[in-house]
Amino acid sequence: MRHRRRTPHLNKPADQRKALMRALTTALLREGRITTTKARAKAIRATTEKMITLAKDGSLAARRQALAYIYDKELVRSLFEQAPERYRDRPGGYTRILRTVRRRGDGAEMAVIELV
């Protein structure tokens, strides 16, 4: 049952929210470290960890699932090459969220999310 298993809405319609999540996940996997709001960082943590777990699996089905979510085909290829040896001994927890100073314009809580 999925009762009370809500996804963070991030004050956006569903299509914009999905596009934002995909874009932030792609940016994090490409750059290794991004600065965003604390709520967005917490929201993309699960999808980023799922993509890395798929890369550790390395099967064709896992690669196709990752390609369906991540925008960049070359990024998926490099992720599937590097993730198995980089995260071999780590069963999860591939990201770290560090809180930073509030944003000057609106006072939003900011955070840095990075790959461990």
Swiss-Prot record:
A GO MF term: structural constituent of ribosome
GO CC terms: cytosolic large ribosomal subunit
InterPro entries: Ribosomal_bL17, Ribosomal_bL17_CS, Ribosomal_bL17_sf
UniProt record, GO biological process: translation
Keyword terms of this UniProt record: Ribonucleoprotein, Ribosomal protein
Segments passing through the bilayer: none
One Pfam family this sequence matches: Ribosomal_L17
Subunit structure: Part of the 50S ribosomal subunit. Contacts protein L32.
PANTHER family: LARGE RIBOSOMAL SUBUNIT PROTEIN BL17M, RIBOSOMAL PROTEIN L17
Similarity field: Belongs to the bacterial ribosomal protein bL17 family.
Alphabetized NCBIfam families for the sequence: L17 (TIGR00059)
Name the record gives this protein: Large ribosomal subunit protein bL17
Native organism: Synechococcus sp. (strain JA-3-3Ab) (Cyanobacteria bacterium Yellowstone A-Prime)
Encoding gene, per UniProt annotation: rplQ
